[in-house]
Amino acid sequence: MRIAPLAAALLLLAAGCHSAFIEATISNRTPDTLTLVEVDYPSASFGTQTLASGQDFHYRFKVLGSGPTSILWTDATHHDHKSTGPSLQESDEGTLTVAITPTNPTWTFQPINKK
């Protein structure tokens, strides 16, 4: 009788657990250093104090809830900027890239395992 619970536990371990997450990259494609870079997504945010020209910032997060994304940053002349990105759903998984350029940021969301 002890074998059945043990076998069930091993079966669950073998099947593995998978948690949906977003692998995000913020890229500074401007000629100047950006400061106070923040990405807002449903239920949380992340960011970095500075992002040098040509530098990338990587962050991995889990989406809890649903809603839009946005990015805020301050340029070298101390002007604040905001750009709205794609909406995310709680089950979303994939990569999110934001390339900040001298004109406008470019957002790319590539979902995987979309249900």
Residue ranges of each PLM-predicted region?
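Bacterial N-terminal signal peptides
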Residues: 5-15
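Post-signal-peptide N-terminal segment of Sec-exported extracytoplasmic proteins
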Residues: 36-82, 108-110
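Asparagine-centered strand-capping/turn motif at beta-strand->loop junctions
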Residues: 24-31
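Bacterial signal peptide processing site
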Residues: 16-20
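Intrinsic-disorder/low-complexity, polar/charged segments enriched in Ser/Thr/Lys/Arg/Asp/Glu/Gln
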Residues: 21-23, 56-58, 95
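Extracellular beta-sheet/turn segments enriched in Thr/Pro/Gly and aliphatic residues
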Residues: 80, 86-115
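Short loop/turn positions at the edges of beta-strands in beta-sheet-rich folds
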Residues: 30, 63-65, 92
